[in-house]
Amino acid sequence: MAACPIARTAMYHGLEDQLSQTTTVEVQVDVPDSADARWCVEQYYRELAERFDTGFDPVKSNPAPDEDLVPPRGYFVVARLDGHPVGCGVLKRKNPTTGEIKRMWTASSARRRGVARKVLHTLETLAREAGFTVLHLETNRTLAEAQAMYRKEGYIEVDAFNDEPYAHHWFEKHLQSNSSR
C-alpha cells in the first residue's frame, strides 16, 4: 500500500532536512568589498530593518568601515554552504587587547545548522591569533536567538560600552589562549 501524498511529502521534507544538516559549512576570511561579503551585509541590513521595531538605518549605526575590516585592523568572514554565502561576521580591533564582533548574520534558509556558531568560533580564533584577550559585542532586544547563543558561548552581559543606538544588550567574553582551551 502506497503512502498517502501528505505522508510522502512529510517524509521527503524530513529526508531533505537530514541531508541539509550534513552539508559542510565553510567559514573563511574574505575582503569586505567582495560580492559575497556585500551580499551578506545587504541581507543583514534588510533583515534588521524588518525585525527591529524602530527599523534600521546603517547610517545611524556605529560604523565599521571597510578599512577597519582587513588585517591587521580587523577581519570579515563569510560562511558558505555548498559554495553559496549564507552568513557573515566581523572582528574589529578596538585596542591592542580588545576586539569587537559585529555584523553577525545567518540567512534564514541556513539557520539551525550551526552556521552562526561556526562564524563566532572562527572570529574568536582570529581574535586569539591577533592577541586579543577580550571580545565585545552588542545586540538588539528583538534578536533573542543571538542573545541565547552568545550566553551559551560564554559571553556575559555587561554595561554599555558604546553608544550604538540599536543596541539593548552588551556582551563581553574573556578569551583563553588556544593552549589552555
Per-region residue spans from a language model:
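Loop/helix-junction capping segments adjacent to catalytic residues or to phosphate/diphosphate-binding pockets
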Residues: 35, 113, 144
